[in-house]
Each structure stands twice: as C-alpha cells, then as structure tokens.
C-alpha cells in the first residue's frame, strides 16, 4: 500500500480473511440522535458512529440547545432530551456539510417550533456545494401543506433554506416518494409532534422502503406507533411526545459491511459482526444478493459470514438496497456473465450522481458498461484484463470503498481522495488492508 492525503494505491490481493466489527450505522446514528433530542428523558446511545455526518448532526443539536456528553472514543453519547420542539435565537445558521441524514430530518423537525416570546424568527440550513445540488423540494412542498413557512435562499428546490417557527398543523399531506425515502422519514419523525393528526399519502412509487422500516421501528422504540397502510398511506396521531428508551444500541452499518462481504465472495472468507439476521437495516439483504450470485452465506443473530463461491452475473431490481447495490457494480467484474442493476434512479441524487460516476470509473479499469437512466449493465473481466487506473471518488465515500475491490484482480488500483470515507467509515482502508494478503 502507498498512501498519502491525496491518494492510496492498493496492490493486488491474493485473498482476504478475518473478522470485522462494524462501525455504527449512519442512518441509525442520526435518527437516534434526533429522536433522543426531541424525547422526554435521558438516552444513552451506544456504538454511535464517529463520522462527518454524525458530527454535523451533533453540532447542529448543540446549537439548538441540546446538552449531551460524548465518550472519549465518541461511540457512547448521553443526551438530555428536550421533551419538546427545538427553540432558537433568530439569525442562527446550521452548517450540515453533505449530510442528507441531517439536512432532511432537521428540516422537518425545525418546522415544529412555534413562535416564542420573540415572536416569529428564522433559522437557516446550509451545507457544502454538493448539498446545494441535492433536491429537497418534495419535502418542503409536503411540510408547507402542513403549515410550514420555508424559503429557498439560492436555487428553487435546493438548500440553503430558511425556516420560520410557525409550527406544523398536521392534516392531510401528499408527498412524492419516488426520489428519496429520506423525505418521508423526515416527515414521519416530525408528524407525532404536529398540532393535529397527520395522514401522509405517497405519490408515485416509494423508493428504498427498508429505510422507512428503520424509521418506523425506531419511532416505535421511542414510544410512537404509526399506522402503515401498504406504504401508500401513513397515519400518525398528533400532539404526542417521544419517550426515551433510556438506552439504544446502534447496529453496525450494514452498508459498510457490503465491501468486506463482497471481497470475501470474490476471494476469501470474512465474518462481520454488529449486524445479523435480526437487523432492522434493509442493506443486510445485500448478503442474499451475493448468495444468488453464488457465494456461501452463514447468518447469526449478530454476524454475517461470507465465503467465496463461483460468482455468476445477476439481473435484479435493487431499489431496496440502493447504497449496498453500488458494491454489486464492482463485484460484477469478477462474476461470470453480465450483471444488470435496475431501478436505481435515486443513485443520481446521492452524494454525487452515482450512476454516471460508477459507469465512468468502471470503464477506466477496462470494463464494458452501459449506463441507462435508472439502470447499469456491466460485463465482467478476466483477472488479467483489469487495467490500473486512478479512480475519482467525487467526494463520495461509497465510490472510494467500492473501488477497493479492484485490487482483488491482478492489478493495483489508485483511489483519489481516500479521506472521503470519513463520511461513514474513517478507518475503512486500514480495516480492509488488515484482512488482506498480498499476491506473492
């Protein structure tokens, strides 16, 4: 391995073997922080992820008057719940980096605030340049139906936004579910604290349903039940208060597990702990995709183990695992026969346009790729056909981690800006290399 701040080169790997304790899930960490802040009582979160996205959420909560204590290794957080909506001084601006899991839920939660003795005031939510390209209009439109006052400060439909503390009335709300499940997650988490009951109707086909399951299960843990009518309509009683569960264990990140599990499916045997058959994360189903391709899978309550098999290409709708599906795109190069990943339009509105980015970088290593509007078709390569390439990562943690798998060929790979993995897995490359054995 050759590593500096701007690039890391991974030399050819002959096999991978070992055990990985997964860092906490980003999706669960930021949901748990927000629910703990709004709940009545003190909550101790364990196995919290220490990453950029979580840091942005923690900083925002501190600015909003939430008190918490973090352990030295930042994996345990004790939060004093407010037991009410947030309040703020007029003129406050929250910088949320490129953290969609902070921007979307906070947008909805801040709309719950009602005029205080200062009367109506505003709060601004902003972030990195890429955040200003990530759509938020479907969420804003839905919140405005419930009485929110939100203004776009630059480009219509995108952050930065200003929110006024007018409160959320509840009522009947229609929301487009076809771009991002985070919009619905944000609305669901705010709805119990609205003034009246809320009926949320989904327009279009709801994407990434397993992420909605995470939200509903976590709301239940914090004392709130939602009636889910076949993912088309959600009924939420208003005027409720979240109750602290006192302790909440953040599961290991199933999306982060995908890189190690895929590497094992190609060339070895790896056990990941912190996520298992009872996980509430949809990305645990990534292991089922590897099994369909020919890998050998063993499930435990708190682990998934994968052992290599003769991998075959697959043609599959992967809308239910959009983040982990990226890992299938690089795994496909090592399978026999073509792979088609379908119904993944929402790759285009993530940290970067992941469909174009993935197609571009796969071609650099020698692959034949067809990029569709909402699918990608990938032809495999023989181990000797891989070409050395410098992989652009587009400030996208998942691009960097996916392309580590290229080193399982007979060719080294150089990954630019490897520190972008700090978004969810700051120690990824060290952890990955600890399990690998070099080609002799």
Curated annotation (Swiss-Prot):
PROSITE patterns (UniProt xref): EPSP_SYNTHASE_1 (PS00104), EPSP_SYNTHASE_2 (PS00885)
What keywords are annotated for this sequence in UniProt?
Amino-acid biosynthesis, Aromatic amino acid biosynthesis, Cytoplasm, Transferase
- Enzyme Commission identifier(s): 2.5.1.19
CDD domains attached here?
EPSP_synthase (cd01556)
Which biological process annotations from GO are given for this protein?
amino acid biosynthetic process; aromatic amino acid family biosynthetic process; chorismate biosynthetic process
Gene Ontology MF: a single term: 3-phosphoshikimate 1-carboxyvinyltransferase activity
Gene Ontology, cellular component aspect: cytoplasm
Question: What is the uppermost EC class here?
Answer: transferase
InterPro entries tied to this protein: Enolpyruvate_Tfrase_dom (IPR001986), Enolpyruvate_Tfrase_sf (IPR036968), EPSP_synthase (IPR006264), EPSP_synthase_CS (IPR023193), RNA3'P_cycl/enolpyr_Trfase_a/b (IPR013792)
Pathway involvement of the protein, from the record: Metabolic intermediate biosynthesis; chorismate biosynthesis; chorismate from D-erythrose 4-phosphate and phosphoenolpyruvate: step 6/7
Protein residues bound to phosphoenolpyruvate:
26, 100, 134, 182, 354, 398, 423
Major localisation = cytoplasm
Amino-acid biosynthesis found in the keyword field: yes
The entry marks the following residues as binding 3-phosphoshikimate, namely 26-27, 31, 180-182, 208, 323, 346, 350
What reaction is this protein's catalytic activity? 3-phosphoshikimate + phosphoenolpyruvate = 5-O-(1-carboxyvinyl)-3-phosphoshikimate + phosphate
The subcellular location is:
Cytoplasm
Q: Which Gene3D superfamilies match?
A: Enolpyruvate transferase domain (3.65.10.10)
Active site at: 323
PANTHER family noted in UniProt: AROM/DEHYDROQUINATE SYNTHASE, PENTAFUNCTIONAL AROM POLYPEPTIDE
Q: How does it assemble?
A: Monomer.
Family per record? Belongs to the EPSP synthase family.
Primary role: Catalyzes the transfer of the enolpyruvyl moiety of phosphoenolpyruvate (PEP) to the 5-hydroxyl of shikimate-3-phosphate (S3P) to produce enolpyruvyl shikimate-3-phosphate and inorganic phosphate.
Q: What is this protein called?
A: 3-phosphoshikimate 1-carboxyvinyltransferase
């Amino acid at each position: 391995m050759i590593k500096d701040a701007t690039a890391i080169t991974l030399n050819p790997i002959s096999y991978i073997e070992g055990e990985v304790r997964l860092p906490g899930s980003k999706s669960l960490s930021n949901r748990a922080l927000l629910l703990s802040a709004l709940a009545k009582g003190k909550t101790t979160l364990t196995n919290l992820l220490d990453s950029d996205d979580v840091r942005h959420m923690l900083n925002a909560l501190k600015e909003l008057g939430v008190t918490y204590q973090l352990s030295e290794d930042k994996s345990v957080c004790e939060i004093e719940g407010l037991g009410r909506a947030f309040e703020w001084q007029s003129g406050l601006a929250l910088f949320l980096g490129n953290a969609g899991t902070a921007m979307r839920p906070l947008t909805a939660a801040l709309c719950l605030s009602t005029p205080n003795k200062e009367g109506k005031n505003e709060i601004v939510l902003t972030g990195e340049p890429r955040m200003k390209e990530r759509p938020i209009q479907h969420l804003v439109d839905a919140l405005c139906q419930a009485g929110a006052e939100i203004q776009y400060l630059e480009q219509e439909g995108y952050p930065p936004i200003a929110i006024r503390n007018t409160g959320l009335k509840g009522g009947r709300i229609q929301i487009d579910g076809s771009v991002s499940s985070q919009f619905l997650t944000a609305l669901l988490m705010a709805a119990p604290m609205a003034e009246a009951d809320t009926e949320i109707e989904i327009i279009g086909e709801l994407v990434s349903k397993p992420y909605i399951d995470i939200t509903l299960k976590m709301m239940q843990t914090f004392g709130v039940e939602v009636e889910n009518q076949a993912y088309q309509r959600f009924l939420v009683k208003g005027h409720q208060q979240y109750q602290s569960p006192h302790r909440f264990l953040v599961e290991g990140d199933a999306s982060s597990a995908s890189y190690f599990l895929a590497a094992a499916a190609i060339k070895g045997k790896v056990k990941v702990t912190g996520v298992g058959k009872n996980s509430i994360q949809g990305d645990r189903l990534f292991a089922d995709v590897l099994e369909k391709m020919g890998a050998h899978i063993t499930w435990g309550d708190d682990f998934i183990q994968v052992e290599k098999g003769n991998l075959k290409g697959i043609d599959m709708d992967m809308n239910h695992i959009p983040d982990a599906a990226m890992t299938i795109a690089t795994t496909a190069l090592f399978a026999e026969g073509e792979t088609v990943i379908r119904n993944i339009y929402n790759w285009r509105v993530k940290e970067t346009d992941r469909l174009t980015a993935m197609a571009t970088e796969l071609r650099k290593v020698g692959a034949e790729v067809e990029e569709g509007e909402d699918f990608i078709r990938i032809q495999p390569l023989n181990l000797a056909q891989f070409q050395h390439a410098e992989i652009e990562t587009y400030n996208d943690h998942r691009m960097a981690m996916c392309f580590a798998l290229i080193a399982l060929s007979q060719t080294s790979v150089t990954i630019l800006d490897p520190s972008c993995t700090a978004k969810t897995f700051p120690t990824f490359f060290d952890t990955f290399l600890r399990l690998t054995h070099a080609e002799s």
